[in-house]
Amino acid sequence: YSDFNTSVKINYYDPYDYHSFVNASEAILALQPDGVMMAPTAPQYTKGFTDRLQASDIPYIYIDSNIKNVPPLAFFGQNSRQSGYFAARMMMLLARDEKEIVIFRKIHEGIVGSNQQENREIGFRQYMEEHHPSYNILELDLHAERNDEDNEMLDEFFRSHPTVKNGITFNSKVYIIGEYLQSHGKKDFNLIGYDLLDRNVACLKEGSVFFLIAQQPELQGANGIKALCDHLIFKKEVTCINYMPID
């Protein structure tokens, strides 16, 4: 679309700090863009931004996570609940006869980093309730703002739960647990995570992560920009919900 004098400005925010999202949204509004593509944060913070975009007649697109009660021009990403449901099925291929699973989270002020992570966990728990209701699902909340405490918290968890052999995290930082397992020689733990970050892939290759569920972020972004251009330049109708395949 370079022939149409289009340009893209990227603004970043910390997904575990809602103040960071608010600051980034203010910076974006100050630019007076023709359109916005975003990976939204929690609904209550996203809505303040989208309300102002709507008031200014600025179309916006979601990637990564959809917020149904704050509908965008289009959404590109996974069905987060179905993704979590699928992850539970994969987990049970590994768990076999064992009866405990741990969910690892990264939290800030008691809240996970995105609506997407919450929906993945809902889908995961739905599958477990439907098919394996006797399983004990444990939780370990690591602090997003205090990474130096991760190893201590993991040490304490595994001391307290020495028989747990299966775990999952719904954020993109499975490498935190994978690298811990490597450094402590824990080769009998089945770990599932999300996203093809370099450190995640390294853990997959080393064997400390068994499965990575990817969601084609590059294709999400490319399709999102295309949808904005189709809407703004060519006045084409854009499909609202566009689910990406699970890799």
Kindly label every feature range from the protein language model.
Residues 1, 73-74, 100-112:
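Short beta-strand segments enriched in small/hydrophobic residues
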Residues 1-3, 83-87, 114-135, 149, ...:
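Short, solvent-exposed amphipathic alpha-helices that sit
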Residues 76-102, 151, 200, 216-233:
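Hydrophobic alpha-helical segments within soluble ligand-binding/sensing domains
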Residues 111-112, 128, 216-247:
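Hinge/cleft segment of the Venus flytrap/periplasmic-binding protein
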